[in-house]
Protein backbone atom coordinates (compact mmCIF):
# COMPACT_ATOMS: atom_id res chain seq x y z
CA UNK A 1 0.00 0.00 0.00
CA UNK A 2 2.84 2.38 0.80
CA UNK A 3 4.24 1.98 -2.71
CA UNK A 4 0.85 2.79 -4.22
CA UNK A 5 0.63 5.93 -2.11
CA UNK A 6 4.12 7.07 -3.07
CA UNK A 7 3.42 6.40 -6.75
CA UNK A 8 0.22 8.40 -6.62
CA UNK A 9 1.99 11.31 -4.94
CA UNK A 10 4.70 11.26 -7.56
CA UNK A 11 2.01 11.61 -10.21
CA UNK A 12 0.29 14.39 -8.25
CA UNK A 13 3.40 16.50 -7.65
CA UNK A 14 2.68 18.50 -10.81
CA UNK A 15 -0.81 19.18 -9.47
CA UNK A 16 0.71 20.55 -6.28
CA UNK A 17 3.05 22.79 -8.29
CA UNK A 18 0.18 24.09 -10.41
CA UNK A 19 -1.96 24.73 -7.33
CA UNK A 20 0.82 26.85 -5.81
CA UNK A 21 1.53 28.66 -9.08
CA UNK A 22 -2.13 29.56 -9.54
CA UNK A 23 -2.89 29.93 -5.82
CA UNK A 24 -5.56 27.22 -5.96
CA UNK A 25 -6.49 25.05 -2.96
CA UNK A 26 -5.38 21.45 -2.55
CA UNK A 27 -8.12 19.45 -0.82
CA UNK A 28 -8.21 15.93 0.58
CA UNK A 29 -11.46 14.60 2.04
CA UNK A 30 -11.95 11.40 4.03
CA UNK A 31 -14.75 9.96 6.16
CA UNK A 32 -12.57 7.71 8.30
CA UNK A 33 -8.91 8.67 7.70
CA UNK A 34 -7.43 5.15 7.72
CA UNK A 35 -3.71 4.73 8.25
CA UNK A 36 -2.84 4.76 4.54
CA UNK A 37 -4.77 8.03 4.14
CA UNK A 38 -2.86 9.59 7.04
CA UNK A 39 0.41 8.70 5.32
CA UNK A 40 -0.90 10.14 2.05
CA UNK A 41 -1.98 13.40 3.72
CA UNK A 42 1.37 13.81 5.46
CA UNK A 43 3.21 13.21 2.18
CA UNK A 44 1.09 15.82 0.39
CA UNK A 45 1.86 18.29 3.18
CA UNK A 46 5.59 17.60 2.83
CA UNK A 47 5.52 18.13 -0.94
CA UNK A 48 3.41 21.26 -0.53
CA UNK A 49 5.86 22.77 1.96
CA UNK A 50 8.79 21.76 -0.27
CA UNK A 51 7.23 23.56 -3.24
CA UNK A 52 6.56 26.60 -1.03
CA UNK A 53 10.25 26.40 0.01
CA UNK A 54 9.30 26.03 3.67
CA UNK A 55 10.68 22.52 4.06
CA UNK A 56 12.22 23.41 7.44
CA UNK A 57 8.66 23.46 8.86
CA UNK A 58 7.93 19.88 7.80
CA UNK A 59 8.37 18.14 11.17
CA UNK A 60 6.53 20.74 13.24
CA UNK A 61 3.59 21.02 10.87
CA UNK A 62 3.35 17.27 10.30
CA UNK A 63 2.99 16.89 14.06
CA UNK A 64 0.39 19.68 14.24
CA UNK A 65 -1.57 18.25 11.34
CA UNK A 66 -1.64 14.81 12.97
CA UNK A 67 -3.01 16.28 16.21
CA UNK A 68 -5.65 18.32 14.42
CA UNK A 69 -6.77 15.41 12.24
CA UNK A 70 -7.25 13.35 15.40
CA UNK A 71 -9.30 16.15 16.96
CA UNK A 72 -11.50 16.51 13.87
CA UNK A 73 -12.08 12.77 13.57
CA UNK A 74 -12.89 12.58 17.28
CA UNK A 75 -15.44 15.39 16.91
CA UNK A 76 -17.24 13.39 14.21
CA UNK A 77 -17.10 10.20 16.27
CA UNK A 78 -18.58 12.09 19.20
CA UNK A 79 -21.62 13.12 17.11
CA UNK A 80 -22.55 9.59 16.03
CA UNK A 81 -21.86 8.24 19.53
CA UNK A 82 -24.21 10.76 21.13
CA UNK A 83 -26.87 10.11 18.51
CA UNK A 84 -26.68 6.37 19.12
CA UNK A 85 -27.03 6.94 22.87
CA UNK A 86 -30.03 9.22 22.34
CA UNK A 87 -28.22 12.17 23.92
CA UNK A 88 -28.32 15.82 22.85
CA UNK A 89 -24.74 16.97 22.41
CA UNK A 90 -25.85 20.61 22.81
CA UNK A 91 -27.44 19.93 26.20
CA UNK A 92 -24.84 20.42 29.00
CA UNK A 93 -26.24 17.58 31.15
CA UNK A 94 -26.40 15.17 28.22
CA UNK A 95 -22.91 16.22 27.19
CA UNK A 96 -21.50 15.49 30.63
CA UNK A 97 -23.29 12.14 30.74
CA UNK A 98 -22.15 11.10 27.26
CA UNK A 99 -18.51 11.98 27.79
CA UNK A 100 -18.18 9.70 30.82
CA UNK A 101 -17.74 6.57 28.72
CA UNK A 102 -17.10 8.10 25.29
CA UNK A 103 -13.37 7.46 25.15
CA UNK A 104 -13.43 3.87 26.40
CA UNK A 105 -16.44 2.75 24.35
CA UNK A 106 -15.33 4.29 21.08
CA UNK A 107 -11.72 3.18 21.49
CA UNK A 108 -12.78 -0.44 21.99
CA UNK A 109 -15.11 -0.36 18.96
CA UNK A 110 -13.63 2.34 16.74
CA UNK A 111 -14.27 0.61 13.39
CA UNK A 112 -17.98 0.44 14.17
CA UNK A 113 -18.14 4.17 14.92
CA UNK A 114 -16.04 5.07 11.88
CA UNK A 115 -18.52 3.21 9.69
CA UNK A 116 -21.33 5.14 11.37
CA UNK A 117 -19.50 8.38 10.53
CA UNK A 118 -19.30 7.35 6.90
CA UNK A 119 -23.02 6.57 6.76
CA UNK A 120 -23.82 9.88 8.44
CA UNK A 121 -21.74 11.74 5.86
CA UNK A 122 -19.39 13.18 8.48
CA UNK A 123 -16.07 13.98 6.85
CA UNK A 124 -12.71 15.54 7.58
CA UNK A 125 -11.25 17.80 4.90
CA UNK A 126 -7.68 19.08 4.66
CA UNK A 127 -7.08 22.25 2.63
CA UNK A 128 -3.63 23.57 1.73
CA UNK A 129 -3.25 26.85 -0.14
CA UNK A 130 -0.72 29.54 -0.90
CA UNK A 131 -2.36 32.99 -1.06
CA UNK A 132 0.02 35.75 -2.06
CA UNK A 133 2.77 35.51 0.58
CA UNK A 134 0.88 33.43 3.15
CA UNK A 135 0.37 29.69 3.53
CA UNK A 136 -2.98 28.39 4.81
CA UNK A 137 -3.39 24.94 6.33
CA UNK A 138 -6.98 24.09 7.24
CA UNK A 139 -8.69 21.10 8.79
CA UNK A 140 -12.44 21.19 8.24
CA UNK A 141 -15.16 18.88 9.46
CA UNK A 142 -18.93 19.13 9.21
CA UNK A 143 -19.62 18.70 12.93
CA UNK A 144 -20.37 22.17 14.27
CA UNK A 145 -18.91 23.13 17.65
CA UNK A 146 -21.19 23.21 20.67
CA UNK A 147 -21.07 26.20 23.02
CA UNK A 148 -19.24 24.13 25.63
CA UNK A 149 -16.65 23.02 23.08
CA UNK A 150 -16.08 26.63 22.01
CA UNK A 151 -15.55 27.59 25.65
CA UNK A 152 -13.05 24.77 26.23
CA UNK A 153 -11.09 25.77 23.12
CA UNK A 154 -10.98 29.38 24.31
CA UNK A 155 -9.80 28.31 27.76
CA UNK A 156 -7.02 26.20 26.27
CA UNK A 157 -5.84 29.01 24.01
CA UNK A 158 -5.87 31.43 26.94
CA UNK A 159 -3.84 29.02 29.08
CA UNK A 160 -1.04 28.46 26.56
CA UNK A 161 1.07 31.32 27.89
CA UNK A 162 1.40 29.48 31.24
CA UNK A 163 3.55 26.76 29.69
CA UNK A 164 7.06 26.92 28.30
CA UNK A 165 7.52 23.31 27.21
CA UNK A 166 5.52 20.24 26.24
CA UNK A 167 6.94 18.37 29.21
CA UNK A 168 5.43 20.96 31.53
CA UNK A 169 2.06 20.61 29.82
CA UNK A 170 2.10 16.82 30.00
CA UNK A 171 2.94 16.99 33.69
CA UNK A 172 0.21 19.43 34.71
CA UNK A 173 -2.72 19.27 32.29
CA UNK A 174 -5.29 16.54 32.13
CA UNK A 175 -8.79 17.11 30.83
CA UNK A 176 -10.52 13.77 30.90
CA UNK A 177 -13.60 15.24 29.21
CA UNK A 178 -11.68 15.52 25.95
CA UNK A 179 -9.45 12.52 26.37
CA UNK A 180 -5.95 13.81 26.95
CA UNK A 181 -7.12 17.36 26.15
CA UNK A 182 -3.63 18.44 25.20
CA UNK A 183 -3.92 18.72 21.42
CA UNK A 184 -4.54 22.44 21.06
CA UNK A 185 -1.98 23.46 23.68
CA UNK A 186 0.71 21.22 22.19
CA UNK A 187 -0.03 22.50 18.68
CA UNK A 188 0.44 26.10 19.84
CA UNK A 189 3.68 25.22 21.64
CA UNK A 190 4.93 23.47 18.51
CA UNK A 191 4.12 26.55 16.45
CA UNK A 192 6.00 28.69 18.97
CA UNK A 193 9.06 26.48 18.53
CA UNK A 194 9.24 27.51 14.86
CA UNK A 195 8.76 31.21 15.57
CA UNK A 196 4.97 31.43 15.35
CA UNK A 197 2.31 32.08 18.00
CA UNK A 198 -1.32 31.43 18.85
CA UNK A 199 -2.14 34.36 16.54
CA UNK A 200 -1.28 32.00 13.68
CA UNK A 201 -3.96 29.57 14.90
CA UNK A 202 -7.70 30.06 14.39
CA UNK A 203 -10.84 28.03 15.11
CA UNK A 204 -14.16 29.20 13.67
CA UNK A 205 -17.33 28.11 11.88
CA UNK A 206 -17.87 28.74 8.17
CA UNK A 207 -20.39 27.31 5.68
CA UNK A 208 -21.65 24.65 8.11
CA UNK A 209 -18.10 23.47 8.86
CA UNK A 210 -15.81 23.77 11.85
CA UNK A 211 -12.51 25.15 10.58
CA UNK A 212 -9.14 24.93 12.30
CA UNK A 213 -6.67 27.12 10.43
CA UNK A 214 -2.93 27.61 10.71
CA UNK A 215 -1.58 30.66 8.86
CA UNK A 216 2.12 30.72 8.04
CA UNK A 217 4.24 33.39 6.41
CA UNK A 218 5.79 32.46 3.09
CA UNK A 219 9.55 32.32 2.76
CA UNK A 220 10.38 36.00 3.29
CA UNK A 221 13.77 35.95 1.58
CA UNK A 222 12.40 34.27 -1.52
CA UNK A 223 9.32 36.49 -1.80
CA UNK A 224 11.40 39.64 -1.32
CA UNK A 225 13.91 38.54 -3.95
CA UNK A 226 11.23 37.57 -6.45
CA UNK A 227 9.44 40.89 -6.01
CA UNK A 228 12.66 42.84 -6.61
CA UNK A 229 13.46 40.73 -9.67
CA UNK A 230 9.93 41.26 -10.99
CA UNK A 231 10.39 45.02 -10.82
CA UNK A 232 13.80 44.79 -12.45
CA UNK A 233 12.59 42.63 -15.34
CA UNK A 234 9.46 44.74 -15.92
CA UNK A 235 11.51 47.92 -16.20
CA UNK A 236 14.22 46.26 -18.32
CA UNK A 237 11.66 45.37 -20.96
CA UNK A 238 11.53 48.18 -23.50
CA UNK A 239 10.20 46.13 -26.40
CA UNK A 240 6.99 44.16 -26.73
CA UNK A 241 7.55 40.51 -27.74
CA UNK A 242 5.48 39.34 -30.71
CA UNK A 243 5.40 35.78 -32.05
CA UNK A 244 7.06 35.73 -35.48
CA UNK A 245 4.28 34.09 -37.51
CA UNK A 246 1.66 36.39 -35.95
CA UNK A 247 3.76 39.43 -36.81
CA UNK A 248 4.16 38.27 -40.41
CA UNK A 249 0.39 38.02 -40.79
CA UNK A 250 -0.38 41.50 -39.50
CA UNK A 251 2.65 43.00 -41.26
CA UNK A 252 1.25 41.75 -44.56
CA UNK A 253 -2.20 43.15 -43.72
CA UNK A 254 -0.95 46.67 -42.99
CA UNK A 255 1.20 46.64 -46.14
CA UNK A 256 -1.95 46.62 -48.28
CA UNK A 257 -2.88 49.95 -49.95
CA UNK A 258 -6.36 49.62 -48.45
CA UNK A 259 -6.49 48.36 -44.89
CA UNK A 260 -9.01 45.67 -44.01
CA UNK A 261 -9.60 46.72 -40.41
CA UNK A 262 -11.73 43.72 -39.54
CA UNK A 263 -8.92 41.38 -40.60
CA UNK A 264 -6.42 43.49 -38.65
CA UNK A 265 -8.64 43.36 -35.57
CA UNK A 266 -8.87 39.57 -35.85
CA UNK A 267 -5.09 39.25 -36.18
CA UNK A 268 -4.56 41.42 -33.08
CA UNK A 269 -7.01 39.27 -31.12
CA UNK A 270 -4.71 36.28 -31.71
CA UNK A 271 -1.61 37.63 -29.96
CA UNK A 272 -0.92 39.27 -26.58
CA UNK A 273 1.97 41.32 -27.99
CA UNK A 274 -0.03 42.65 -30.95
CA UNK A 275 -2.80 43.73 -28.56
CA UNK A 276 -0.28 45.42 -26.25
CA UNK A 277 1.16 47.36 -29.20
CA UNK A 278 -2.25 48.69 -30.20
CA UNK A 279 -2.95 49.72 -26.63
CA UNK A 280 0.48 51.34 -26.17
CA UNK A 281 -0.11 53.79 -29.01
CA UNK A 282 -3.82 54.28 -28.28
CA UNK A 283 -3.04 55.27 -24.69
CA UNK A 284 -0.99 58.18 -26.01
CA UNK A 285 -4.25 59.59 -27.36
CA UNK A 286 -6.72 58.43 -24.71
CA UNK A 287 -5.52 57.41 -21.24
CA UNK A 288 -8.64 55.27 -20.73
CA UNK A 289 -8.18 53.15 -23.87
CA UNK A 290 -8.69 49.43 -23.28
CA UNK A 291 -10.11 46.96 -25.76
CA UNK A 292 -8.98 46.20 -29.28
CA UNK A 293 -11.97 47.86 -30.95
CA UNK A 294 -11.49 51.09 -28.96
CA UNK A 295 -7.73 51.16 -29.61
CA UNK A 296 -8.15 50.65 -33.35
CA UNK A 297 -10.71 53.46 -33.51
CA UNK A 298 -8.05 55.84 -32.18
CA UNK A 299 -5.35 54.86 -34.69
CA UNK A 300 -5.14 55.99 -38.31
CA UNK A 301 -4.19 53.74 -41.21
CA UNK A 302 -0.72 55.28 -41.38
CA UNK A 303 -0.23 54.79 -37.65
CA UNK A 304 -1.19 51.12 -37.96
CA UNK A 305 1.26 50.71 -40.84
CA UNK A 306 4.04 52.05 -38.61
CA UNK A 307 3.02 50.21 -35.43
CA UNK A 308 3.11 46.82 -37.16
CA UNK A 309 6.12 47.47 -39.37
CA UNK A 310 9.67 46.10 -39.27
CA UNK A 311 10.93 49.60 -38.48
CA UNK A 312 9.03 49.95 -35.18
CA UNK A 313 11.68 49.75 -32.41
CA UNK A 314 8.99 48.82 -29.86
CA UNK A 315 8.68 45.35 -31.39
CA UNK A 316 10.86 42.34 -30.61
CA UNK A 317 10.13 39.34 -32.79
CA UNK A 318 10.31 36.02 -30.94
CA UNK A 319 10.38 32.53 -32.39
CA UNK A 320 7.47 30.29 -31.55
CA UNK A 321 7.97 27.34 -29.21
CA UNK A 322 5.67 24.64 -27.80
CA UNK A 323 5.52 26.45 -24.44
CA UNK A 324 4.80 29.82 -26.05
CA UNK A 325 2.27 28.29 -28.41
CA UNK A 326 0.37 26.74 -25.51
CA UNK A 327 0.51 30.02 -23.61
CA UNK A 328 -0.89 32.01 -26.55
CA UNK A 329 -3.61 29.40 -27.07
CA UNK A 330 -4.51 29.63 -23.37
CA UNK A 331 -4.73 33.43 -23.58
CA UNK A 332 -6.90 33.30 -26.71
CA UNK A 333 -9.32 30.82 -25.14
CA UNK A 334 -9.50 32.75 -21.87
CA UNK A 335 -10.16 35.97 -23.77
CA UNK A 336 -12.92 34.37 -25.82
CA UNK A 337 -14.55 32.85 -22.73
CA UNK A 338 -14.40 36.23 -20.95
CA UNK A 339 -15.92 37.99 -23.97
CA UNK A 340 -18.85 35.57 -24.14
CA UNK A 341 -19.44 35.33 -20.41
CA UNK A 342 -19.63 39.11 -20.23
CA UNK A 343 -22.20 39.21 -23.04
CA UNK A 344 -24.25 36.40 -21.49
CA UNK A 345 -24.39 37.80 -17.94
CA UNK A 346 -23.98 41.58 -18.22
CA UNK A 347 -27.70 42.33 -17.83
CA UNK A 348 -27.84 40.45 -14.52
CA UNK A 349 -24.87 42.17 -12.90
CA UNK A 350 -24.08 45.59 -11.47
CA UNK A 351 -20.89 46.77 -13.17
CA UNK A 352 -18.68 49.73 -13.98
CA UNK A 353 -19.31 51.91 -17.04
CA UNK A 354 -15.77 51.27 -18.27
CA UNK A 355 -16.58 47.63 -18.98
CA UNK A 356 -17.85 46.00 -22.16
CA UNK A 357 -17.32 42.70 -23.98
CA UNK A 358 -14.42 44.05 -26.07
CA UNK A 359 -12.64 45.24 -22.91
CA UNK A 360 -13.14 41.83 -21.31
CA UNK A 361 -11.58 40.13 -24.34
CA UNK A 362 -8.49 42.33 -24.02
CA UNK A 363 -8.25 41.66 -20.27
CA UNK A 364 -8.50 37.94 -20.97
CA UNK A 365 -5.44 38.25 -23.22
CA UNK A 366 -3.57 40.59 -20.86
CA UNK A 367 -4.06 38.24 -17.92
CA UNK A 368 -1.24 36.14 -19.44
CA UNK A 369 1.20 39.07 -19.79
CA UNK A 370 3.33 37.90 -16.87
CA UNK A 371 3.78 34.36 -18.20
CA UNK A 372 4.55 35.72 -21.69
CA UNK A 373 7.21 38.15 -20.46
CA UNK A 374 8.92 35.45 -18.37
CA UNK A 375 8.91 32.98 -21.26
CA UNK A 376 10.25 35.50 -23.82
CA UNK A 377 13.11 36.94 -21.77
CA UNK A 378 16.24 37.79 -23.74
CA UNK A 379 19.53 36.11 -22.84
CA UNK A 380 20.67 39.39 -21.31
CA UNK A 381 17.55 39.55 -19.13
CA UNK A 382 17.86 35.91 -18.04
CA UNK A 383 21.50 36.42 -17.16
CA UNK A 384 20.72 39.52 -15.11
CA UNK A 385 17.89 37.78 -13.24
CA UNK A 386 20.27 34.96 -12.30
CA UNK A 387 22.87 37.50 -11.21
CA UNK A 388 20.31 39.18 -8.95
CA UNK A 389 19.21 35.86 -7.44
CA UNK A 390 22.80 34.89 -6.62
CA UNK A 391 23.03 37.81 -4.21
CA UNK A 392 20.92 35.62 -1.90
CA UNK A 393 23.66 32.95 -1.85
CA UNK A 394 22.23 29.62 -0.65
CA UNK A 395 18.64 30.48 -1.67
CA UNK A 396 19.40 31.55 -5.23
CA UNK A 397 18.34 28.31 -6.92
CA UNK A 398 15.02 28.33 -5.06
CA UNK A 399 14.53 31.97 -6.04
CA UNK A 400 15.14 31.19 -9.70
CA UNK A 401 12.72 28.26 -9.48
CA UNK A 402 9.96 30.49 -8.08
CA UNK A 403 10.79 33.27 -10.53
CA UNK A 404 10.62 31.06 -13.62
CA UNK A 405 7.99 28.52 -12.61
CA UNK A 406 6.14 29.87 -9.56
CA UNK A 407 3.52 32.59 -9.18
CA UNK A 408 5.89 35.41 -10.22
CA UNK A 409 3.75 36.07 -13.30
CA UNK A 410 1.21 37.84 -11.06
CA UNK A 411 3.86 40.27 -9.78
CA UNK A 412 5.22 40.98 -13.25
CA UNK A 413 1.78 41.43 -14.77
CA UNK A 414 0.82 43.99 -12.13
CA UNK A 415 4.09 45.92 -12.36
CA UNK A 416 4.20 45.90 -16.16
CA UNK A 417 0.57 47.06 -16.42
CA UNK A 418 1.32 50.03 -14.17
CA UNK A 419 4.54 50.82 -16.01
CA UNK A 420 2.64 50.75 -19.32
CA UNK A 421 0.10 53.20 -17.85
CA UNK A 422 -2.74 50.78 -18.38
CA UNK A 423 -5.90 52.33 -16.88
CA UNK A 424 -6.14 51.68 -13.15
CA UNK A 425 -9.35 49.66 -13.41
CA UNK A 426 -7.76 47.26 -15.92
CA UNK A 427 -4.68 46.85 -13.73
CA UNK A 428 -6.93 46.15 -10.74
CA UNK A 429 -8.88 43.48 -12.57
CA UNK A 430 -5.95 41.48 -13.95
CA UNK A 431 -4.13 41.80 -10.62
CA UNK A 432 -7.07 40.56 -8.54
CA UNK A 433 -8.47 37.73 -10.63
CA UNK A 434 -7.41 35.06 -8.12
CA UNK A 435 -6.35 37.07 -5.04
CA UNK A 436 -6.32 40.53 -3.41
CA UNK A 437 -10.10 40.83 -3.91
CA UNK A 438 -10.50 42.87 -0.75
CA UNK A 439 -8.61 45.71 -2.43
CA UNK A 440 -10.97 45.88 -5.41
CA UNK A 441 -13.78 48.46 -5.82
CA UNK A 442 -17.15 46.67 -5.80
CA UNK A 443 -18.16 47.91 -9.26
CA UNK A 444 -15.35 45.88 -10.83
CA UNK A 445 -16.14 42.62 -9.03
CA UNK A 446 -18.25 41.31 -11.93
CA UNK A 447 -15.30 41.65 -14.31
CA UNK A 448 -12.96 39.91 -11.85
CA UNK A 449 -15.43 37.04 -11.46
CA UNK A 450 -15.78 36.74 -15.25
CA UNK A 451 -12.01 36.68 -15.67
CA UNK A 452 -11.65 34.13 -12.86
CA UNK A 453 -14.30 31.85 -14.37
CA UNK A 454 -12.77 32.17 -17.84
CA UNK A 455 -9.29 31.28 -16.58
CA UNK A 456 -10.58 28.35 -14.54
CA UNK A 457 -12.63 26.99 -17.46
CA UNK A 458 -9.50 26.95 -19.58
CA UNK A 459 -7.28 25.50 -16.84
CA UNK A 460 -9.91 22.82 -16.21
CA UNK A 461 -10.09 22.03 -19.93
CA UNK A 462 -6.28 21.76 -19.98
CA UNK A 463 -6.49 19.36 -17.00
CA UNK A 464 -4.40 21.74 -14.89
CA UNK A 465 -7.24 22.50 -12.44
CA UNK A 466 -9.76 20.12 -10.88
CA UNK A 467 -13.37 21.10 -10.32
CA UNK A 468 -13.04 21.11 -6.53
CA UNK A 469 -10.36 23.82 -6.81
CA UNK A 470 -12.79 26.34 -8.29
CA UNK A 471 -14.40 28.83 -5.92
CA UNK A 472 -17.89 27.50 -5.12
CA UNK A 473 -19.27 30.95 -4.35
CA UNK A 474 -18.30 32.27 -7.77
CA UNK A 475 -19.66 29.15 -9.49
CA UNK A 476 -22.97 29.67 -7.70
CA UNK A 477 -23.23 33.24 -9.05
CA UNK A 478 -23.41 31.74 -12.53
CA UNK A 479 -25.80 28.94 -11.62
CA UNK A 480 -23.11 26.23 -11.68
CA UNK A 481 -23.98 23.68 -8.99
CA UNK A 482 -21.92 20.66 -10.05
CA UNK A 483 -19.15 19.50 -12.35
CA UNK A 484 -21.54 18.32 -15.05
CA UNK A 485 -22.99 21.83 -15.40
CA UNK A 486 -19.47 23.28 -15.53
CA UNK A 487 -18.46 20.88 -18.30
CA UNK A 488 -21.60 21.79 -20.23
CA UNK A 489 -20.75 25.49 -20.01
CA UNK A 490 -17.23 24.83 -21.35
CA UNK A 491 -18.54 22.66 -24.19
CA UNK A 492 -21.01 25.35 -25.27
CA UNK A 493 -18.27 28.00 -25.20
CA UNK A 494 -15.90 25.84 -27.26
CA UNK A 495 -18.61 25.01 -29.78
CA UNK A 496 -19.41 28.70 -30.15
CA UNK A 497 -15.71 29.46 -30.68
CA UNK A 498 -15.37 26.75 -33.34
CA UNK A 499 -18.39 28.14 -35.18
CA UNK A 500 -17.28 31.77 -34.92
Where do the model's predicted regions map?
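Helix-loop-beta hinge of the Bergerat
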Residues: 22-54, 147, 153-166
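Conserved ATP-binding N-box helix of the HATPase_c
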Residues: 53-122, 127-130, 183-193
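Non-catalytic interface/linker regions that flank or bridge core catalytic/transmembrane domains
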Residues: 1-12, 158-175, 184-192, 198-307, ...
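Short beta-strand element(s) in the Bergerat
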Residues: 22-26, 124, 133-137, 210
